[in-house]
Amino acid sequence: VHTAQVHMGNTVAVWGVGGVGAHLVQLSKLAGAVPVIAVDLNDAVLERAKRLGADYAFRSDDPDLMKKIEDITDGRMVGIAFDAVGIQPTLRACVESLDINGKAVSIGLSPQNIDAGTFLEFNLKKKQLLGHLGYKRQDIARLADMLSYGRLDLTESISKIIPLTDIKQGIDDLENHRGNPIRI
């Protein structure tokens, strides 16, 4: 949210609303973004995103997704789109959803090459593509303050608490998406 400079009145869309994406929904809302749009393939994840503050939740495989975004933004599309997945189709969709001068922020990590659309589309609409990795110490301190004041809710991002003796099982559950975990 800091990298994209989300502020009051921005329209924000988040692709991939698992752990990081769910927090992006909350932080964008706290920064004053309106509307905040969650996009994912999993209906349960989309429901959680709505509980966490997303104004709209759409499936990424919906063939009418861009039309729906266009309709709710009165044709403007989004000012900021976050890719919390890190694969080519997701980044392309983020870029496609951008308004003139819009920013796409890539957060998800994968070994795939970046493919974000045509130069024509980027240049005519003055779109921006930003990368992001990690946080600074002061960002962590701000998040801790937000937690202590009750502004940020991380309870839905903790799927299960396990003893250290079960760590192998916890990692296996995460890797195999058993129970749709976010954090164990």
Question: Whereabouts are the PLM-identified features?
Answer:
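Glycine-rich phosphate-binding loop and adjacent beta-alpha segment
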Residues: 55, 87-151
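Short loop/turn segments at beta->alpha junctions
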Residues: 61, 65, 86, 136, ...
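Conserved amphipathic alpha-helix within the SDR
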Residues: 65-75
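A generic alpha-to-beta junction signature in SAM-dependent methyltransferases
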Residues: 4-6, 73, 85, 98-99
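Structural detector of well-ordered beta-strand residues that form the stable sheet scaffold
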Residues: 13, 37, 103-105, 130, ...
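N-terminal Rossmann-like NAD(P) cofactor-binding module of classical short-chain dehydrogenase/reductase
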Residues: 79-82
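Mid-domain Rossmann-like dinucleotide-binding core that forms the NAD(H)/NADP(H) cofactor-binding site
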Residues: 1-63, 67
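C-terminal hydrophobic helical "lid"/dimerization subdomain
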Residues: 92-96, 137-184
